[in-house]
């Protein structure tokens, strides 16, 4: 090939500098700060792995978690009965400072054998332990839960509440050790879609929103040293949870998730 003329060489160098930089797929796929990114591709469960009580990590028993019509659906039609098989669908990456948006709805009837409290009950677990460290018969990961509840047609039943398997929080300036506390949301009956969000600032403040309205706020999510599973996760006497995995729940009532989006926030 002949050598480039000086004008051609300058043109080639200019074009090369103007070309967009091609990033490795792993870097290009990472959520960018201050931008909403979908964690669900609308086609399959790529990036997500189930852990169901009594089954090995990765065993999607009974096709519990499936994708149909661009929606993550939690179903129990292949179960004889629920039998305490609580499930969690884990996303592959850990997060620390972020805002998570989930659109969900409850449908159909509860699986036979499901506990009464789990009727129209699901949620998102965050600051989760590594699912690979969970016991085979462990019902819930050590985590904080944004608990989703559907109305029962009578009375008040708030959603995007807080529950704390193996953890505690600081609420109104005091260590809060009961398992759950309610938000101040409205009750959502029927099979309507509901938008729930959580804003997490590492081991600092956590806020819960429903349909854009702030319904709960607390701080300092931390391991409970009295919990057997949490105790194994404590290192150097540090209890505060700075980061963790995210998971979607299966608690015996059919539920659907059509949007799971995250916005990574600056620390």
Regions found by a protein language model. Give the residues of each.
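N-terminal secretory signal peptides that target proteins for export/translocation
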Residues: 1-6
């Amino acid at each position: 090939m002949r050598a480039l003329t000086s004008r051609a060489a300058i043109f080639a160098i200019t074009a090369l500098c103007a070309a967009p930089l091609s990033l490795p797929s792993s870097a290009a796929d990472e959520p960018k700060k201050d931008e909403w990114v979908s964690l669900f591709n609308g086609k399959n469960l790529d990036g997500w792995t189930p852990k169901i009580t009594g089954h090995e990590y990765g065993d999607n028993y009974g096709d519990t978690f499936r994708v149909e019509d661009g929606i993550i659906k939690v179903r129990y039609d292949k179960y004889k009965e629920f039998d305490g098989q609580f499930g969690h669908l884990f996303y592959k990456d850990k997060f620390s400072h972020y805002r998570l948006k989930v659109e969900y709805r409850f449908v159909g009837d509860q699986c036979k054998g499901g506990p009464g409290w789990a009727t129209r009950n699901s949620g998102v677990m965050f600051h989760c332990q590594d699912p690979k460290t969970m016991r085979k018969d462990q019902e819930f990961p050590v985590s904080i839960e944004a608990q989703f509840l559907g109305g029962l047609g009578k009375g008040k039943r708030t959603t995007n509440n807080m529950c704390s398997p193996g953890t505690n929080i600081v609420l109104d300036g005091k260590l809060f050790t009961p398992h759950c506390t309610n938000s101040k949301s409205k009750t959502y009956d029927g099979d309507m879609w509901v938008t729930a969000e959580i804003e997490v600032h590492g081991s600092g403040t956590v806020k819960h929103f429903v349909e854009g309205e702030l319904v709960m706020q607390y701080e300092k999510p931390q391991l409970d040293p009295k919990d057997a599973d949490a105790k194994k996760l404590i290192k150097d006497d540090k209890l505060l949870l700075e980061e963790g995995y995210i998971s979607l729940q299966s608690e015996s009532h059919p539920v659907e998730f059509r949007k799971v989006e995250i916005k990574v926030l600056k620390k």
